[in-house]
Amino acid sequence: MRSSFVLVLALVVAQLASGAAAQSPVDVPFRQFRLDNGLNVILHRDATVPVAAVNVWYHVGSANEKPGRTGFAHLFEHLMFEGSKNVREGEFDTLLESAGGDNNGSTDVDRTNYVIDVPANALELALFLESDRMAYLLDTMTPELVDGQRDVVKNERRQSYENRPYGMASLELDELLWPEGHPYRWPTIGYMEDLTAASYDDVVAFFSTYYAPNNASLVVAGDIDFDAARALVEKYFGEIPRGPELVPVAAPPARLTGVTRKTLTDRVRLPRLYLAWLTPRHYAPGDAALDVVSAVLAGGKNSRLYKRLVYDLQIAQDVSAFQGSAALGSQFLIVATARPGHTAAELNAVIDEELSRLQREPPAAREVERALNQIEASFYRGMERVGGFGGKADQLNSYYKATGTPDYFAKDLARYRAVTAAAVKGMVEKYLPKDRRVELSIVPGEKK
């Protein structure tokens, strides 16, 4: 399954059970070099098990698109698996499966990534496949192929958003939170009318602009030999020509000056409330502390909102909170689903009471400790895996894209360990005010 993440979180704290995390040093040794064509390459050896991961990040996401031409980055997430010059249509998956490997891809606002996990002895196959679609995808990409995948994406949009209960919420929130002209305002999957209007030449031009070695980063990790891996990378990627030089995405200032309220009716059984705020960009001051805030509020059954809404008052079926971090700005989101007979307004009132309480007095030390334990547990679980989404290969690329260096594991952990109860209180005061946010309610009724 090809997954697309509109809100990609480095740490999904709300889904973790609390528990003590290890305090061992963070050590992810790597070698880094750059090919003449601009491809950034990161090698990491982990011989714990005989597997290898090939992880490519293209520094292009939906934020690189233009109004009227949305959904292209996600469309290529599909097209990249449909064959290239030396790999026939359908062969990408079958070759990897025959070798005992698997693969996937995802798209968000800032990047598109592709992951391949194989037995270590199939590393060369994985590098060949990845390089062939970088270099030669357009050699076999026909208008008919684009039309076929365009229809697949349209159907995905219908299934995942338009015809799914509460499915339009994330699209509505983006339009309510971000100002006109901001590249986070349109959905990663694209608008239906843009997908329909896109010409074959438009699609080709997008690939030619962004899917080039100088706009990508490659991680090879696992049971590898550094010199042999470098030789394979140079063999398969070294002759791919550079693409055009790109300028960073620009965005207008984003700020909320009041409360924006909207109610949608949908074919749902229960009301659901979404509260959203604009917050600091990823890795900026406050970003880590807001992850901790989300865990204090809704990270597990002992969290404040879960205890109050689900256990004590029994007016909610579920509640979650998270800091959705991204390069040009982030959003903090609280989502709660009412129990039968209760309303979104009731949920809103209780959530505001708990936010006010955190604004008046900091959380107890044990609450912060529990939140940090959840975050560290998630961090170390990712480090236990070489490949896949969120494994070490993926995280090396993530750190490189966000901070300019892969060497950020220890620094990342340190920024969470530095969060105090006073900092949690300060973040709620500064970034989660009741008078500057978006309030979206989805209630039962005819879908509109």
Regions found by a protein language model. Give the residues of each.
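Active-site SXXK
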Residues: 70-84
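M16 family metallopeptidases and their MPP-like homologs
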Residues: 44, 49-65, 71-75, 89-136, ...
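Bacterial N-terminal signal peptides
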Residues: 4-16
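Boundary at the C-terminal end of the N-terminal hydrophobic targeting segment
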Residues: 19-22
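An aromatic/glycine/proline-enriched structural segment found at the starts
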Residues: 138, 180, 213, 217-281, ...
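Short acidic-hydrophobic surface loop/beta-edge motif
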Residues: 31-36, 262-266
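Short, small/polar residue-rich loop motifs at catalytic or cofactor-binding pockets
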Residues: 26-29
